[in-house]
Amino acid sequence: MKISFIEPAILLYAFAMTLTIPLTAQYVYRRIWEETGNYTFTSSSNVSECEQNKSSSTFAFQEEVQKKASLFSLQVEISGLIPGLVSTFMLLSSSDNHGRKLPMVLSSLGSLGTNLWLCAMSYFDLPLQLLVASTFIGALFGNYTTFWGACFAYIVDQEKEYKHRIIRIAVLDFMLGVVTGLTGLSSGYFIRELGFAWSYFIIAVVVLVNLAYILFFLSDPIKESSSQIVTMSCSESLKDLFYRTYMLFKNGSCKRRSLLCLLIFTLVVYFFVVFGITPVFTLYELGPPLCWNEVYIGYGSALGSLSFLSSFLGIWLFSYCLKDIHIAYVGIFTTMVGMMLTAFTRTTLMMFLVRISFFFTIMPLSILRSMLSKVVHSTEQGVLFACIAFLETLGGVTSTSAYNGIYSATVAWYPGFVFLLSAGLLVLPAVSLCMVKCIGWEEGSYTLLIHDEPSEHTSDS
């Protein structure tokens, strides 16, 4: 008997992803350190190997390592851009007809293969450039945006009422906060006690368990239409996929199209900033003046992950006195303040305190996704989340590439510049939300917008 709870799959995947990101960043940093300096990276119980005297040759060496690590991360992200975009768009768009489980299964297979390859690389000390190839191959199966997009569409399929939907998403954010917080807290101890190879192996086992749950225990609310598969060729299916995407923006009134485009723009730009700055945080904390080791980075990651928990509480409390659009404003402006404060942080205590200003960072992402789901028909949820995941994949790779490039170019004269730049970029989603408000967004207006749509959502040819 199959069940319809997507939450276990999301939490297991979140554990794997949350542990993989800091592990990979530190693994790349250490490998480049050892290859550049020809000696083994060591870490004390308090701080990492870090020289704070700018006149020292070691300080210049550290800056060189940070530049190389940032540029290598840029290469890795770019390698997965094109296959990730194509696979994400096609898998999620086709999930309206073929079910939500297929994107989850394939993206989990890609994650499993990538972590097994990282395990082999760290165990056998294989060339670091092979990470670029594994990222490219893994992206062919989809990536994290593919998995999250399918999960959000799965929840929307089950929860027809908007209030129930947003509560379930908020509860999910709460659970994600607990899992990612504990994972981030333990990531440093994983590295110190188990090393990179065994840590990646544990992640691979978790992904394998998650894959088994999705395949054998999770039900699919979208039933596969066998007649459509028989009568439609591959080219016709691809044509139908693009046609439904085109109709998503063509159907409905001018107000609906304007709201849809503005909300997608707001979500993508905000995601661009928040996701792009994440790997820079690790590099910023590893270098002077903070000079954190893997345990402190784990503490920082855990504190940052509390934004899922605090965002859940924020949505729950603010929903009693604020409208959706105002809740999104709170998250954007508090994140903007946090970026500006981080740029001027020079001590460990201040860095921990600055993390508090990021406690509502996830709120706009949850709210904007819920707002978007209100302006499209239930049969278009897969296409909508395919577009969102496609743009998030493009924005995610572009942002991490851009931020890594900017950080490597500015780390020598001012490491905090990227955070000031992020604060400035957050003005764009704030202005976009103002335009949404001016057009006339109302909490219950989505019903009228959906009724504006034609009943046909698929191609007749």
Curated annotation (Swiss-Prot):
Glycans are attached at N38, N46, N53. Belongs to the major facilitator superfamily. SLC46A family. GO terms for molecular function: copper ion transmembrane transporter activity; symporter activity; transmembrane transporter activity. Residues 92-103, 157-170, 219-260, 323-324, 369-381, 437-461 are cytoplasmic. GO terms for biological process: cellular response to 2,3,7,8-tetrachlorodibenzodioxine; vacuolar transmembrane transport. This is Lysosomal proton-coupled steroid conjugate and bile acid symporter SLC46A3. Its main location: membrane. GO terms for cellular component: lysosomal membrane. The keyword Hydrolase does not apply. It comes from Rattus norvegicus (Rat).
